[in-house]
Amino acid sequence: MIKILTGRQTDPVQEKILEEAVKNYQQHPENETFIIVPNHIKFTTEVRAINKLATSKNKSETAVKNLHVLSFSRLAWFFLKDAEQGLPTQLDDAASAMLLTHIIEKEKDNLTIFETINSGLVQQLYNTILQMYDGNIDLDNIDETNLDQETKSKIHDLRIIYDAYIKEIAGKFSTKNEVQVELNKVLANNKSLSNASFYFCDFSHFSLQETLTIKLLIRKAQNVILGFKTKLGDINPQAEAGDYDYVIQQTIKRFTSFLQERNINYTVNNFPLSSKPTNRENLNSLWTESINKVDNIKKHVQLVKADSRYAEAYFVARSIYQQVALGNYRYHDFLILAPDLKEYETYLTPILRQNKIPFFNDLQQEMKYHPLVVLIESLFNMYDEKTISLNTQSIIAILKTHLMIPSWYKEEAEFIHDVDELENFVLAHGIEHNLWQRPFSHFVNAEVIRLDKMDEEIAKLNRLREFLINKITELLEKLKKEESSQKALTMFFDFLTNNGIASRLEQWRNDANDAGDLQQAQQPEQLWDLLIQLLKDYLMINPEKFDVDEFFNMLINAFREANFSQIPSTLDAVNLSELGMVQTGGYKQVFIIGATSGNLPAIQKTPGFLTPENINQLQNSFASDAYLEDNQQLNNLDQNYQFGLALALAQDKVYVSYPILNASNERLDSSIYYKRLFDYVDSEFEQHDLPEKFNDLLSFITSADASLGYLSYINSIDSSKEFDELLRITHEQSPQKTEIVLQASEFNNQPEDIGQELAEKLYGQNLNSSVSQLETFYENSYEYFLTYGLRLHRRLENEFDVIQAGNYFHETFDRLVKQLNKEHIDLASLNSFELERMLNSVRNVMKNEGKYAQLMNDPFNEYLFKCLDHTTSKVAHNWCKNLNKTPLRAKYSELSFGVGEKLKGLSLDVPNLSGNHRVDLRGKMDRVDIAHLADKNQVLAQVIDYKSSAKKFDLSMFYNGIAMQMVSYLDILVKNNQFFAGNNELSLLGAFYQTVTRQLERLNSNKLIDSQLNIRDNVIDGKPKLMYTGLINNNPQVLTEAEPFLDNSSRQSELYSMVKTKKNGTFSLPTDRSFSEEELELLLEYDEFLIKEASNQILSGKIELNPYRQGKSKSALTYSDYKDIFFFDAMLRQNQYHEITRLSKKDLLSKIKERLGKED
């Protein structure tokens, strides 16, 4: 009997199939009865079938002999186990990936499109080869006349790889789908199937070989019953692409056509329409557009719009928890589906665990993230044919796997501590590549980290370094020399066992078993078993000449394609799965999460090795008994049907939800499926991240522990008697945690003042500080406390960053100036060759010293140094050329001032503080230029500060204490008149930024062309970017003394930005950066006021989390290393920026006078 049973997606097709199969088994127990279902639901279907049999016997359990519930692969093994000639060892996905990598590497000279190998490409190739094998396709018989070049190239390479693959496995291995081919061979010759019955259900599509299996059984078996779910529960031979059930109707059509062509009798049974359809059936009719409208559908469908994925996941957990707690449901009554479960792995499973909800996640877990795989990849990253490349990232990765722990460590915690310390030391000293071969004691003289002064600690770390480096280099050197595959694999295996890696995996397994985590306990064993199998497979694939690159590539690609097998830890558990995967029926409630426009429908856009266009071109070249399906197209055509199946799974209620924001706070739109459902129900529930009032609390209440955070939040905004009762019940169950959480809810994210006494212990009675430190205080006083009070800092890394580049600039110019002064050479007297020779002399000395020498070990850093040298050369040559236009010469470089220095700093009494306290300002000026005006008994001075990017003096930042540097430097000059001018008068020109750059103007810049459309020659070489900019004295006499050429009318300064003379002989100066001598004195006075004010706050122990913000993009938090400590949130009442608004010169002077109590 051949029968096709069809029903709607809500009809119990599987129940009917199981019922008939069990009935057949009871009537003919001596005959074989087979129930064939997708592998994904084999276990649950088997349980149902046996339960149904037991129920029919009025028993709670029963034994069976000839009733089999199998997947297609298990059906194959069932028949092949007794076959005369068994199959060779099956080549699994991982081993196949390894073999294909070997073939591609071997044949790469003959291939046209394979330049590099990656795991994704190998997987695509593997799937295509399986399709070719499964589809009975002969690549040699493909007519290439009408193929485009891309398709021809792919077929060319595919033919080479496919032939080599089949040749390699012949007689040694079988592919995972070859078992299906062999099954059909056995079935074709089997003469004992006449009494067997086969029942198929829950399939919507079959492969060519599976289709052939069913056709063979139709001709040989006593009974073949096929169950399908279609749109209307009937067969529609005229279904077209785009129709709701096109894919499954095409599947049915293949069988009906086969039966009709061979005049085989068959019956078609349909499920009858229900006279009183349930809400579930009504929803399905709406979804398939069989009806237009129905009442009361809201009882069956709930739409949820969540604030975030966290809120969405919490809604699911809360709904399940509450309904189970009320006794209406068991955990196994719930199914959670998502288009992509990976999006929810950091939300859903932790929330379910927090609420103690048992669950089974059937999403496959990849092996490639396991520590053993990381270790193997890291070993390969250090291998090179010429030399062993000891890269730091790989070495640290191996240490952090915790798989190679030397025997002298008795406690793992001690090893972990040393690994952290070793990483700190290595990063601080820039240890990379061959530097790993040197003892750590060779680096400590640099004294860049605390560890450098701890000899015993360095000895411990060096012992760990020696152990690891010796083991790694010994293994890789041996593998590089070895030619025998057998011996090489033995070396590799010995490395894993002799260094305790195997025993470490065994320990992890035992620990997981002891903790009751059966899933985790299986992973080390599965991984080790696969590794052993891969080593055996490699030996069979490549028994002769061993190749290290090939070995590691094959091993890594194999692991990347491997997954851990999953087992449920309990039968009563919520099931987590993905849309599109076959599910058994019987769920009472289904949650479909992640219903965003980007996820549903889940349209596949990334093709396989052969694109849909390639496949369409090839279709006409295949023989009649061969075909190649476009799985991507098949998936895309089946999306609506699959979503309908998901909706039909829920007996009582289905929830469909989506988040309005993703993890990056980007707005998400709901899926077109969600919008269709909204048209039916016209309502949605909004799940917020937090309850807004007490009445919202029901949407958040689960267990006492999980709900406590929400309760404490409500307590802070909307307390009530009812709430107090809830809190009392929670306190009874978890008193200690409740008290801690309630205290935390009252947390004020503002640091507390430490008081004068503690501040004095941190900073001393007198404050010895620099300008930049006080600027940090005004940027954010809490950052000042963390940096200079507690002395916290981010981990030191000896990398060539912006700070290092700036240091290199400064040191180059410092050494140049000192060399010139030492040899009494006027820079203006040097020609270009002499200047460059002096610069090179300075650089060579620098690069052989300290931190720069370590950085030079990296070839890329060497290139960066050359770029910096070009930049400093350009600035130095520009400076040299400009010296004939000014009498100012560099007298001092990196001039330090403060306590203990030749140059006095600012020493100011700190007012309004008990006791006697003083602030001593120290620092260093990049350069001070001096010009002796002998005829006037006067000395002209300017301060130069090097900057790696363009900078202007910002009045508003100065007023708020964040840009005091330049004014403070001028104050130092004034306070040290004797040092700079002796008995002469010191005249201040100003304080200027010198941008160290070789940047040119862009070709489309309007600065290159004047109003007459002529090119400005002085702009072409980027010279304006090298002009001084900053605070300047607006006294005309001082200006002409600094640049004598400006004594003529209509002259543009060649030294100072935005300075020129007008036709009438007066000066045009930058409005907000030029000051009279009286105004400069006012700035100096206010600068000292700021210094004293900051010192008072610091020494009194006052601390505020008060970062500045200027505009929308610039703030004290932009580049702060302490954001994780601040936990600053401008949305909180306690956390506010202190805003800085732009000031004009007039506003600045007015505000300063007001603050200093001076009359305007």
UniProtKB/Swiss-Prot annotation:
The keyword DNA damage applies. Its EC number is 3.1.-.-. The heterodimer acts as both an ATP-dependent DNA helicase and an ATP-dependent, dual-direction single-stranded exonuclease. Recognizes the chi site generating a DNA molecule suitable for the initiation of homologous recombination. This subunit has 5' -> 3' nuclease activity but not helicase activity. One of its GO terms (molecular function) is 5'-3' exonuclease activity. Keywords: ATP-binding, DNA damage, DNA repair, DNA-binding, Exonuclease, Helicase, Hydrolase, Nuclease, Nucleotide-binding. SUPFAM superfamilies: P-loop containing nucleoside triphosphate hydrolases (SSF52540). The gene is rexB. Despite having helicase-like domains, this subunit does not have helicase activity. It is an enzyme of class 3 (hydrolase). This is ATP-dependent helicase/deoxyribonuclease subunit B. Its cofactor is Mg(2+). Gene3D superfamilies: P-loop containing nucleotide triphosphate hydrolases. Coiled coil: none annotated. Belongs to the helicase family. AddB/RexB type 2 subfamily. Heterodimer of AddA and RexB. InterPro entries: ADDB_N (IPR049035), DNA_helicase_suRexB (IPR014141), P-loop_NTPase (IPR027417), PDDEXK_AddAB-type (IPR038726). Pfam families: ADDB_N, PDDEXK_1. GO terms for biological process: double-strand break repair via homologous recombination.
